[in-house]
Amino acid sequence: MKIERKPSTALLPTPVVLLSVAGHGKEKDNIITLAWVGTVCSAPPMLSVAIRPSRHSHRLVDAAREFVVNIPRAGQLEAVDLAGVWSGAEHDKFAELGFTARPAKQVAAPLIEECPINIECVVRHQLALGAHDLYLAEIVATHYDEELLDSRGRLKTAELDAMAYVDGEYWSLGERLGSHGAAAKAAGRKG
């Protein structure tokens, strides 16, 4: 039996990322933890991030029009959680959370050295949706820790140790279940 509830954000899980953005004027570079992030286009490669207008980082992204999406490891949970709770208006999150800012190649926002994947982005569109603004951003550079790539340059996902966000809780990712298209191939069918 199904139980109907009021409309909610029940699309689960969502990734856990650290978005870094360059400071504006006298403000320091900042980090915000986000879970409402997703791939939206493959050519050109684009992603989306949703940020509440009340957040300090929202103002910085509006000014900079670029940012870096950094993928943290599960072992960084405490710093990840604090980056999402503390305000950059009151905390120097890079210094206080022990993160190292490294220059990006294409944008002014810094990479977080301790994160194994860094995705440089330039905002192409912004939509005011209600509680959140949605930024659609083109990916202009992607960086991987070398040990995460196999000899063919493919991601060794099992070694990434990424996190997911589900209903107010952080979760680790489980085991590999299969590959895209494997069921159709096994059944002798094509799309």
In which residue ranges do the predicted regions lie?
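Basic, polyanion-binding surface patches
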Residues: 1-191
